[in-house]
């Protein structure tokens, strides 16, 4: 009820604590606790599974409440200040500036499940946009603008690197890398996106 979605990533990952952002304290400007949306995601997943197992509609209602909060993190516009597509992707938390995060491929499946349980078309639309956004950062011919950024930052890239995928956009340690970030693993980028795609067939 407090909107307190704090976890490890909120304070001890790449968006660290500082005097204006302390664990357990509300943000002075917004009056909210600092939030990371993974706790919201896992809560929506847990409530969904509780409903499926029990048939008790209260679990579904609680899950939809959590999903409503998660929806606040979905990018519903093309940000004019970013050179990559943004519509449908997900940010990470209230106190960093990462966009198009790989978690959107997981969120896509959660929205799809809620659509199947409720028939709510807005969940289906959010699921499809989140899935589409899961491929925005992939290095491939279909993403010409993103491909050009990769090749500018990594001049050695060529067709053998097609399918490469950064974790998100604008995730960096201060090193100027055109917003590409410096972290990727198969299951948090291209692998997560590819694994979610067949679920929509």
Language model features: what each stretch is:
Residues 1-201:
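Glycan-recognition and catalytic cores of secretory/periplasmic carbohydrate-active enzymes
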């Amino acid at each position: 009820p407090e909107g307190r979605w704090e976890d490890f990533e909120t304070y001890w990952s790449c968006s660290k604590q500082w005097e204006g952002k302390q664990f357990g304290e509300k943000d002075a400007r917004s009056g909210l606790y600092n939030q990371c949306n993974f706790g919201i995601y896992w809560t929506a997943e847990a409530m969904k599974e509780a409903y499926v197992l029990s048939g008790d509609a209260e679990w579904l209602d609680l899950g939809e409440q959590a999903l409503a909060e998660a929806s606040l993190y979905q990018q519903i516009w093309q940000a004019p200040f970013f050179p990559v597509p943004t519509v449908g992707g997900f940010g990470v938390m209230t106190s960093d500036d990462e966009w198009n995060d790989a978690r959107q491929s997981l969120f896509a499946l959660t929205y799809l499940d809620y659509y199947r349980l409720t028939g709510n078309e807005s969940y289906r639309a959010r699921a499809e946009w989140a899935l589409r956004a899961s491929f925005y950062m992939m290095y491939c011919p279909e993403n010409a603008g993103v491909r050009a950024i990769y090749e500018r930052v990594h001049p050695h890239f060529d067709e053998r690197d097609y399918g490469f995928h950064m974790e998100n956009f604008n995730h960096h340690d201060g090193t100027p890398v055109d917003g590409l970030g410096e972290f990727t693993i198969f299951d948090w980028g291209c692998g997560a996106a590819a694994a979610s795609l067949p679920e929509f067939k």
